[in-house]
Amino acid sequence: PRGYPTPMWASATMGGYFGAELKYAGYDGIIIHGRAPAPCYLLIEDDRVSLEDAGDLWGKGIFATQQALKARHSPHHQIATIGPAGENRVRFATIAHRLNNAIGNGGFGGVLGAKNLKAIVVRGTKGVPLADPQGFLQAVRQVWQMAKGGIYRIGKPDAGYPHLACTHACSVRCFTRV
């Protein structure tokens, strides 16, 4: 397949606990500007944010990097990292989290490599305050009512749920168009 044209707009998603941990640290997102002069990783621990030396990690694969950073910090830290493909700015390089989650679309691993950013390591202990506790409980009750009919019916048009939209991850008809 052809590489992405430039300039481009890309988006990707990643499963796992990284996003939740970032929120627990008090952040909704991360914007990274510029390029570090040497390999580093971004360490976020609640309100403390720093760039740490990653010279010893540069050249390592994603699993070895995750293991080294877990040993350096804690098993509770969530880590998103790149491997040699990202370091070398391969256009389809991924960012990996845990053993089975990755951002694989758009070459975001190469973007981190271009910034000399080996990994983002996050630990949050703040929790997430609810802006509307009563509204949240009402939404929980609504989901509970839908789930009472069986979890395999949730999200299917024949279940009679209003305003159901087909998305790229929907299995209703989209999987027949692959």
Segments from the language model and where they lie:
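Intrinsically disordered, low-complexity segments enriched in small residues
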Residues: P1-T13, Y17-V178
